[in-house]
Every structure is written in C-alpha cells, then in structure tokens.
Design a protein with these regions (language model features):
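Conserved RNA-binding domains used in RNP assembly and mRNA/RNA metabolism
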Residues: 2-92
C-alpha cells in the first residue's frame, strides 16, 4: 500500500444562534454567534467551503464518513493538531 499522510485539524468557527423568547432590544444586542469546534481530516477545500471528515476506511475504494461542510466565511481559525502516516512499514 502506498503511504499517505493524513492531517488532523481543529477548526474554530462561528455558527448562527437564535431564540424564541421575549427580550429587550438592549439585551438582544448583546447576543453573539456560537463558537463551535470541529476536529477531523480536511477532505476538500476550495474558496467557498472546507469539508471535514472524522472517519475514513482503509479498504479499496477508500471511503469517508461523518462529513461536516463549513463555509470558509465563518471559519475563525484552523490548527493542525496531529499528523499520521497511513500505510508503509510503520503506518496504520
């Protein structure tokens, strides 16, 4: 099997929040978007979006599961947290 490098990323991003309760305009003005975190492998990235997966299969054909598509416009930061080598003598 050919060796492949897989990188595990931590992505910090902003998400929409909402509420159905009654509130003063002043209190509502203090509300903020939710800060969310996704951990996984980046399986696709272009100028509009980044797609993460936190599961992959080593069978042929390789497949991925548990995908999260995040618009790049809401991503605050991406941090590389781990690199693994798939295949080869010391791989998975």
């Amino acid at each position: 099997m050919k060796s492949k490098i897989k990188k595990i990323w931590l992505c910090k991003w902003k998400d929409i929040t909402g509420s159905a309760d009654w509130s003063s305009p002043e209190r509502a003005a203090k509300e903020e978007p939710a800060i969310c975190y996704t951990v996984g492998f980046i399986v696709h990235q272009d100028k509009h979006k980044t797609i993460f997966s936190n599961e992959f299969s080593l069978v042929d054909p390789a497949e991925i599961g548990n995908r999260t598509v995040i618009p790049n416009s809401v991503i605050v930061k991406k941090t590389l947290i781990h690199t693994i080598k798939e295949g080869g003598k010391h791989g998975m």
